[in-house]
From Swiss-Prot:
It is a peripheral membrane protein. Its cofactor is Fe cation. Belongs to the COQ7 family. InterPro entries: COQ7_proteobact (IPR047809), Ferritin-like (IPR012347), Ferritin-like_SF (IPR009078), Ubq_synth_Coq7 (IPR011566). Fe cation 1 binds at residues 57, 87, 90, 171. Pathway: Cofactor biosynthesis; ubiquinone biosynthesis. PANTHER family: 5-DEMETHOXYUBIQUINONE HYDROXYLASE, MITOCHONDRIAL (PTHR11237:SF4), COENZYME Q10 BIOSYNTHESIS PROTEIN 7 (PTHR11237). It holds the Pfam family COQ7. GO terms for cellular component: plasma membrane. It comes from Nitrosomonas eutropha (strain DSM 101675 / C91 / Nm57). This is 3-demethoxyubiquinol 3-hydroxylase. Fe cation 2 binds at residues 87, 139, 171, 174. It is found in: Cell membrane.
Length: 208
């Protein structure tokens, strides 16, 4: 159930996600790999793809926080909080890599965060089965996007590829976690709407 304390925590998390540099406990994947020379076109492509991935992590943070605020089972809420902390590392990795590539984060991050937070709240209100099912499907779709990006990233951009590869592993673990806690399958129409919405986000974030 929502209360003032939870709302304050949620607002604080939003400010940290959108304004503060993200922190990571694990070493950044690929940090010891060489920074191979990229052409201007390759560097721009890598930066755009990493910007999309950063937006995905902003959305994941918002989604997890919204779901955790309305989760009915304490064990589920704690699992969501833990997953959100792990996603913070992805924020740090992609943020750092975007800077290294000379790119910029999406100017629409507040919009992405707000929309995803609202979805998380709604999913949580529907009950933990749907809450976790929505989470599992989200992570599966994110994992698919990351697999696509591994195909599109320049082969010699080994640092970006290392980050995306580890993120893909982590997202698969989060999907498995959601199912293990009781997440149910979503109706096909909902999956289709999620995929359509995700497509709009990725195409927009590629540029802005």
């Amino acid at each position: 159930m929502l209360n003032v304390d939870k709302l304050i925590i949620g607002f604080d998390n939003a400010l940290r996600t959108l304004l503060a540099p993200a922190a990571t406990l694990r070493p950044i994947p690929g940090k010891d790999l060489p920074e191979n020379e990229l052409s201007k076109i390759e560097k721009r492509e890598s930066a755009a793809l990493m910007r999309i991935n950063h937006v995905g992590e902003v959305c994941a943070q918002a989604l997890y926080q919204g779901q955790a605020l309305t989760a009915r089972n304490e064990q589920v809420r704690q699992a969501l909080d833990q997953a959100a902390r792990e996603e913070t590392e992805h924020l740090a990795w992609t943020e750092r890599r975007i800077a290294e590539l000379g790119g910029h984060k999406s100017f629409l991050n507040p919009l992405w965060y707000g929309g995803s937070f609202a979805l998380g709240l709604v999913a949580g209100v529907l009950g933990d089965k749907w809450n976790l099912g929505f989470l599992a499907e989200t992570e599966r779709q994110v994992e698919a996007h990351l697999a696509d990006h591994l195909q599109r990233l320049p082969h010699q951009d080994v640092r970006s590829r290392a980050i995306v590869s580890q993120m893909k592993v982590d997202e698969a673990c989060h999907a498995t976690m959601a199912v293990s806690y009781g997440g149910g399958p979503l109706p096909v129409p909902i999956k289709a709407v999620m995929k359509f919405s995700s497509g709009i986000m990725t195409r927009t974030a590629y540029w802005v």
